[in-house]
C-alpha cells in the first residue's frame, strides 16, 4: 500500500507545484492527516464496507473535508471512490518527504541520554547541516539511556553515532580480534 500512497502523494505534489500552491497543499494535507490520524480503523471500516456505495463515501468526504482546497478535496474524493481513505496518513508522509526534498530539508531524530540544551541542539543542527548538505533540518529529540553518553542522529537512512555505547562496542570488537 505504500507504493499506492506514494503515487497519490506524487500526483498531488505535481498538481501543487503546477498550480503554485505547494505550501497551501502541505498545510491543508497536514491538517487532514492530523485530523484523521486516530481514526485509521474507522477509515478502514468505511473503505471495506461493501454496503456503502461510492456516493456515500464521497458524501462523507464532502461533509468532513468540505473546506479543503479544490485539488485536495478532489484527491480525497478519488480516495473515497477507490476505497483508499485509510491511506490519508501514508499519503501525507510521502507528500512531506517530497516537500522536504523539494526544499532541500529533512527531519532528524537526535537521541541522547538526557534532554539537550538549546545550545547543544544548535551545535548538533549545524553538524547535521554540514554533514548532509541540507538547507534546513527539523529536529526531534528522544531520550535513550542505552547510549550511556554522547548522542546519535538519524537523518533519513544516515546515522551519525557519537555515543559512548558505540565507542564501547568498537573497543569490544578490537579486544575480540586480539584474542
UniProtKB/Swiss-Prot annotation:
Topology class, membrane: Peripheral membrane protein
UniProt keyword GTP-binding present: no
Subcellular location(s) per record: Cell membrane
Matches recorded under HAMAP family: ATP_synth_delta_bact
Job of this protein: F(1)F(0) ATP synthase produces ATP from ADP in the presence of a proton or sodium gradient. F-type ATPases consist of two structural domains, F(1) containing the extramembraneous catalytic core and F(0) containing the membrane proton channel, linked together by a central stalk and a peripheral stalk. During catalysis, ATP synthesis in the catalytic domain of F(1) is coupled via a rotary mechanism of the central stalk subunits to proton translocation.
Subunit structure: F-type ATPases have 2 components, F(1) - the catalytic core - and F(0) - the membrane proton channel. F(1) has five subunits: alpha(3), beta(3), gamma(1), delta(1), epsilon(1). F(0) has three main subunits: a(1), b(2) and c(10-14). The alpha and beta chains form an alternating ring which encloses part of the gamma chain. F(1) is attached to F(0) by a central stalk formed by the gamma and epsilon chains, while a peripheral stalk is formed by the delta and b chains.
Protein's recorded name: ATP synthase subunit delta
Species assigned in the record: Staphylococcus haemolyticus (strain JCSC1435)
Amino acid at each position: 500500500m505504500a507504493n499506492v500512497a506514494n503515487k497519490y502523494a506524487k500526483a498531488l505534489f505535481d498538481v501543487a507545484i503546477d498550480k503554485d500552491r505547494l505550501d497551501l497543499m502541505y498545510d491543508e494535507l497536514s491538517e487532514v492527516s492530523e485530523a484523521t490520524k486516530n481514526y485509521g480503523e474507522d477509515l478502514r471500516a468505511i473503505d471495506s464496507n461493501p454496503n456503502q456505495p461510492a456516493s456515500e463515501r464521497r458524501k462523507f468526504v464532502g461533509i468532513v473535508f468540505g473546506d479543503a482546497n479544490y485539488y485536495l478535496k478532489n484527491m480525497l474524493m478519488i480516495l473515497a471512490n477507490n476505497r483508499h481513505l485509510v491511506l490519508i496518513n501514508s499519503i501525507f508522509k510521502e507528500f512531506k518527504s517530497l516537500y522536504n526534498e523539494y526544499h532541500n530539508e529533512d527531519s532528524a531524530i537526535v537521541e541522547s541520554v538526557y534532554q539537550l540544551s538549546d545550545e547543544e541542539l544548535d551545535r548538533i543542527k549545524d553538524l547535521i547541516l554540514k554533514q548532509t548538505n541540507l538547507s534546513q533540518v527539523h529536529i526531534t529529540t528522544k531520550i535513550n539511556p542505552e547510549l550511556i553518553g554522547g548522542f546519535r542522529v538519524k537523518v533519513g537512512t544516515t546515522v551519525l553515532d557519537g555515543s559512548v555505547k558505540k565507542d564501547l562496542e568498537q573497543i569490544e570488537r578490537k579486544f575480540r580480534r586480539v584474542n
